[in-house]
């Protein structure tokens, strides 16, 4: 889930009181009503690198209260070191988070043994908190290897993983999904991006994914879920193609490295423009980028609005039905 930032203040290095907590609560509520079965906070578009400790705790509290135990909330526990992660998790537990959305320290790439020990330390310190792995090989400077997945699968609190994607807007990325799935042996759900869902479902009967797109247009995601769980991969491909159309121009022609450089402002602009979640702008230092990246985000957001019409989400249909009833009564 993206972190909603206020639009009525200047966003610069002096910005204070930046969070729109009312919108955060509303966003969590509509995501659940429109089909989300879990909420992960403070990933890339959740402003993990640009929020203060106090802001992250305030956001988590607002979302947990809004969710009210309807689905699990995984709070953003990624920090630069083990001790800061422990401090953050203690605060998350106090506000009622169900689990942790947890990458790993990234100032320097971690060795296999260090990765395993990091997760083991947190799991042993907080045996009552579920862990959702965050395997982003760009953010954390390397992927989790098959051998490490086999060791992490021995930690019972680790229940799922945001697995690195096989396709990003049509661009293939090296992956080892089949071997990693065999290594975890059903003990960790390795969740792919929605574009890859048909692959993980067809080969391993995977019944869930991670999705940023649900924060822009939940209708296509739920339509894809219905198609894939019914094993109608042809229909799922039509939906995926529509989603890729909505993302045209968002991925720089210069390649994936340039995508990562400006993805936070571009995607927050897209999400906000889509109109589903009023997520506002990115926070410093990620609030600046070449103007064409903001333009690409706005263009994709406008296409997301077209996707709302083709694949209306549940709360949209309910609102339209209520409006018709009011019109008829009048």
What are these regions (language model features)?
Residues 30, 62, 121, 151, ...:
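Alpha-helical scaffold segments in soluble metabolic enzymes
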Residues 124-125, 136-253:
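Catalytic alpha/beta core domains of metabolic enzymes, predominantly
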Residues 19-22, 26, 54, 58, ...:
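Conserved active-site and cofactor/substrate-binding residues in soluble primary-metabolism enzymes
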Residues 2-143, 284-287, 308-327:
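Active-site beta->alpha loop and helix N-cap motifs at the rims of alpha/beta catalytic domains
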